[in-house]
């Protein structure tokens, strides 16, 4: 969060899990007890508790992040604020963030892979239910349906990328390491590099002017 507060860079990725507290563990005769004894805050006065750090530029993920983090705990401390501290803002990035977001959005919208991640995320949400069928026959049918749907999503992506597809779900599970086209970590690194290039390109004219006058 300090990178954002001092305007020294761009946070790229997904929202963090929202832990902004400090715990102490004391020993008991038959176990341990954990106390939450303090909270920490950013120089802006905002806590990361329950909210985490929000990225400047979101990258799609197949995970439903609402299900993770301290905010999901029933008695987690709430997000709050304290008075802002005195600090120096470097004013380097904030003014170009709208353009960075626009350029990133255009690439994400055109990306077959990132559209696939959104499809997987939507599919996972559609599978959420508070009910569990206790019938073994129905459970087997449900398992087969899930495997069929996941295989169809995977093969659809691979077809669009001109990659080999799978004939059945088992061969999909036993596949070798995914190629670069399907490696989410490498995709994220590549997009982050693209954002860095955008920053350099957008900032190029002022930097050249500075060099000429210097």
Model-based region annotation:
Residues 48-212:
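Conserved functional hotspot residues or short segments at active or partner-binding sites
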């Amino acid at each position: 969060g300090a990178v954002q507060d001092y305007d020294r860079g761009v946070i790229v990725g997904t929202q963090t899990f929202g832990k902004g507290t400090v715990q102490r563990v004391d020993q008991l005769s038959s176990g341990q007890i954990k106390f939450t004894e303090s909270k920490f805050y950013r120089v802006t006065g905002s806590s990361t508790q329950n909210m985490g750090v929000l990225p400047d530029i979101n990258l799609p993920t197949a995970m439903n992040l609402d299900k993770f983090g301290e905010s999901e705990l029933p008695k987690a401390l709430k997000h709050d604020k304290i008075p802002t501290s005195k600090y120096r803002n470097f004013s380097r990035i904030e003014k170009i963030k709208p353009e960075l977001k626009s350029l990133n959005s255009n690439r994400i919208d055109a990306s077959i892979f990132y559209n696939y991640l959104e499809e997987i995320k939507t599919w996972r949400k559609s599978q959420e239910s508070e009910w569990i069928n206790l019938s073994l026959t129905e459970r087997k049918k449900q398992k087969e349906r899930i495997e069929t749907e996941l295989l169809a999503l995977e093969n659809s992506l691979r077809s669009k990328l001109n990659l080999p597809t799978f004939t059945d779900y088992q061969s999909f599970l036993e596949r070798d390491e995914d190629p670069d086209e399907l490696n989410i970590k490498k995709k994220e690194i590549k997009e982050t590099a693209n954002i860095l290039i955008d920053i350099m390109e957008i900032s190029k004219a002022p930097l050249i002017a500075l060099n000429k006058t210097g």
